[in-house]
Amino acid sequence: MSEMTPREIVSELNKHIIGQDNAKRSVAIALRNRWRRMQLDEELRHEVTPKNILMIGPTGVGKTEIARRLAKLANAPFIKVEATKFTEVGYVGKEVDSIIRDLTDAAVKMVRVQAIEKNRYRAEELAEERILDVLVPPAKNNWGQTEQQQEPSAARQTFRKKLREGQLDDKEIEINLAAAPMGVEIMAPPGMEEMTSQLQSLFQNLGGQKQKPRKLKIKDAMKLLVEEEAAKLVNPEELKQDAIDAVEQHGIVFIDEIDKICKRGETSGPDVSREGVQRDLLPLVEGCTVSTKHGMVKTDHILFIASGAFQVAKPSDLIPELQGRLPIRVELQALTTSDFERILTEPNASVTVQYKALMATEGVNIEFTDSGIKRIAEAAWQVNETTENIGARRLHTVLERLMEEISYNASDLHGQNITIDAEYVSKHLDALVADEDLSRFIL
């Protein structure tokens, strides 16, 4: 898992997300506390539970982006889910236990990649030997059996040197590669994943591990052989256990749109996709054991981060027990004009940088001036105020409209320099921004 300090985590998040310092600090502290807990004695470590977070803020201010960037920094099993996709147990739809199953699947995939990477050097050696066996077949005795040679032959060493220098990359060889296992899809009701997994592995192993001859260039064969040899060096049982440990100790679940499962007013009949889902989430957040196809997973130390706009509902509309399981509340602020200006210029891959790079592929040089950036930010903020406030996402809409003419004619503008200043922006957007009805439908 990540050993970054809170300050380093915030610094990384600042490269992609503007403002929202309180939210960044909270997730940075929560992530660091995962590392701190692992440094404790076994007895005390079991008692330290994660402090789950509830992020509250209007749409388009960076809640989901914080989660997306956190996933890359965490170097731990991470999953982002939408609360609206689940229904109460016993009704048609996904049940909340599938969150932990999906998280475990993600952990297995992550641990497998790490294990393969760890064995890559040895796998490359084995793959090289298999290619050399095709290029320079080992000597055989009178009975057709391969003889064990103390020293590699001079020819083999010569080919090894050429292979490592890339001189044989384009040479075609025929080599035996493992055939893809027979895929069998089995639909099963929730909770029966363990049984379906066993049936699938049974069908896949019926024919054994078959080899299939394929004709490939050495460069392509090398990649496939390295993957095949690395997979052979990985112990599946160890891999599963490591993945389960990673989920239990370092797993992070991000639940988006949690405000959409709040109960609004008095309703009659069962509320299977709102309050029912909240009740089902309780044991997961509090700590329980979930059965997955890889084994039993305890959720006691998984970190849960929930987020929602809470424009119609309020955090107090969540059932009290769930409110108590989300002790850290972070409020994200609505974005201002100056925030929009920073969003257009400061992030590593800001929208303006993306448009400049896209147009450069057609030989068109786009230049955004400070006055142009300011006018774009003002236009986006103005439309947000007069219509629906969708936060930073409005910048995409405004910029797409602004760049439409250039994008359409880019192939005819090869070699030209185009400056986007306040005058250019006003010419293309003022009429739309001023007319509220047009803004509502076009921007």
UniProtKB/Swiss-Prot annotation:
Its main location: cytoplasm. ATP binds at I18, G60, V61, G62, K63, T64, E65, D256, E321, R393. GO terms for molecular function: ATP binding; ATP hydrolysis activity; peptidase activity; proteasome-activating activity. Keywords: ATP-binding, Chaperone, Cytoplasm, Nucleotide-binding, Stress response. CDD domains: RecA-like_HslU (cd19498). Induction: By heat shock. InterPro entries: AAA+_ATPase, ATP-dep_Clp_protease_ClpX, ATPase_AAA_core, Clp_ATPase_C, HslU, P-loop_NTPase. Belongs to the ClpX chaperone family. HslU subfamily. ATPase subunit of a proteasome-like degradation complex; this subunit has chaperone activity. The binding of ATP and its subsequent hydrolysis by HslU are essential for unfolding of protein substrates subsequently hydrolyzed by HslV. HslU recognizes the N-terminal part of its protein substrates and unfolds these before they are guided to HslV for hydrolysis. SMART domains: AAA, ClpB_D2-small. GO terms for biological process: protein unfolding; proteolysis involved in protein catabolic process. This is ATP-dependent protease ATPase subunit HslU. GO terms for cellular component: HslUV protease complex. It is found in: Cytoplasm. A double ring-shaped homohexamer of HslV is capped on each side by a ring-shaped HslU homohexamer. The assembly of the HslU/HslV complex is dependent on binding of ATP. It comes from the Bacteria. The gene is hslU. It comes from Salmonella arizonae (strain ATCC BAA-731 / CDC346-86 / RSK2980).
